[in-house]
Amino acid sequence: EQWLHYIVDEAVPKLRYLSKERNGWDDLPGVIAFGCSLGATHAVNLYLRRPDIFCGCLALSGIYTAHYGFGDYMDELVYMNSPVDYMRNFPEDHPYMELYRNQKAVICCGQGAWEQPDTTWMLKRIFEAKNIPVWVDLWGHDVKHDWDWWYKQTAYYMPYILG
């Protein structure tokens, strides 16, 4: 949990401070969780765990269950870093549900080399069941797990996230 506390308690406040100091903003308009590959996994986890801090999410080619790293092992720490698992059990009356429903999030994955879209689809089904409007998008079989595609996907989705 140290990584979460570092980002929430140190990195985001520093971003807010710098945005005010350098841009004259009284408050940072919003922090979007963004990442590719393992960064996408972290972006989704940060956004889902703290939508009060992160106003949106763009995640490209992530894996959203801890099963890939931990197999069938599960303790509280693993559970809290496995979005498929904790969102499956997320209570409908939790205050974060309203935040999820009023923010923009995109989760995208290709189907080409080195991509693993199965957990993306697991999250899609969970979001649909909970009426959380996340844009879950699967790109073609030619779209591989690599930077050239992530550049294209970022350019494609960022206007939606920022709009």
Question: Positions of the model-derived regions?
Answer:
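Non-catalytic cap/lid and distal C-terminal segments of serine-dependent acyl enzymes
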Residues: 1-163
